[in-house]
């Protein structure tokens, strides 16, 4: 009996910690960088990075959950996992594949790369939401996550623009991004082809959100803590 009580207490404690962490992410993610109507609002670089790291991690978690839910609901028995994943539309941006590669890139270049990846997802995320809404019996769990990711991607982009403005204030970065042309694939009449297009897009979103999450943690350590972390 004591062992069961101990196990139950441990499970409840873990659940409380997970809920607390989720509420923290949602709270921080919902805060604008500056309050509406604020004049000469100044936010420290450290605080900007703190928010960006929490937000990027939140987006990656949502992306992973959405991919897993889509896979479970639509991909089972269709052989999607055995198909070669098509090249992601952001592949042309030559993002580093791991931490070791990212460490070789100058921080200003890595910051601008993050901006480009985030901008490259504005259009596909907008259309992802609209196309999921149009799906027969659109699952609320997937739709709500798509809506949330689209909104938080905009917030993260806003925060990253402020970070770049503080790190390299004299340089105006061109709004370079990779163009997405996958909308026709999401609207195909053939169900298998259409669902695989969704599967591929969600796979790419999970991949890119994971990269951004890792890049931001590396940059926070390098810029805010002078690599002493």
From Swiss-Prot:
Record bears the keyword Signal: yes
Disulfide links within the chain: 34-41, 88-204, 221-229
One Pfam family here: Hormone_1
GO cellular component, one term: extracellular space
Entry-listed glycosylation sites: 61
Database matches in SUPFAM superfamilies: 4-helical cytokines
GO biological process: cell surface receptor signaling pathway; female pregnancy; lactation; mammary gland development; positive regulation of lactation; positive regulation of receptor signaling pathway via JAK-STAT; response to nutrient levels
InterPro entries per the UniProt record, alphabetical: 4_helix_cytokine-like_core, Somatotropin/Prolactin, Somatotropin_CS
Localization annotation: Secreted
MF annotations from Gene Ontology: hormone activity; prolactin receptor binding
UniProt keyword Signal, yes or no: yes
Family that this chain belongs to: Belongs to the somatotropin/prolactin family.
PANTHER family: PROLACTIN (PTHR11417:SF5), SOMATOTROPIN,PROLACTIN (PTHR11417)
Function, as annotated: Prolactin acts primarily on the mammary gland by promoting lactation.
Protein name: Prolactin
Native source organism of the sequence: Equus caballus
């Amino acid at each position: 009996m004591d062992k069961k009580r101990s196990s139950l207490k441990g499970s409840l404690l873990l659940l409380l910690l997970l809920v607390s962490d989720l509420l923290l992410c949602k709270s921080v993610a919902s805060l604008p960088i500056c309050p509406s109507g604020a004049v000469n609002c100044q936010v420290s670089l450290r605080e900007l990075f703190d928010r960006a790291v929490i937000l990027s991690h939140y987006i990656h978690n949502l992306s992973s959950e959405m991919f897993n839910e889509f896979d479970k609901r639509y991909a089972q028995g269709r052989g999607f996992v055995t198909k070669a994943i098509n090249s992601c539309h952001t592949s042309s941006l030559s993002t580093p594949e791991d931490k070791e590669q990212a460490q070789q890139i100058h921080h200003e270049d890595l910051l601008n790369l993050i901006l480009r990846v985030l901008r490259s997802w504005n259009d596909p995320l907008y259309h992802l939401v609209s196309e999921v809404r149009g799906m027969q019996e659109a699952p609320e769990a997937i739709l709500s996550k798509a809506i949330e990711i689209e909104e938080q991607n905009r917030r993260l982009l806003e925060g990253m623009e402020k970070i770049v403005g503080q790190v390299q204030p004299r340089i105006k970065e061109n709004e370079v991004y990779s163009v997405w042309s996958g909308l026709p694939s999401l609207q195909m009449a053939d169900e298998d082809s259409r669902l695989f297009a969704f599967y591929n897009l969600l796979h790419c979103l999970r991949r890119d959100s994971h990269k951004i999450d890792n890049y931001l943690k590396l940059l926070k350590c390098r810029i805010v803590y002078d690599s002493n972390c």
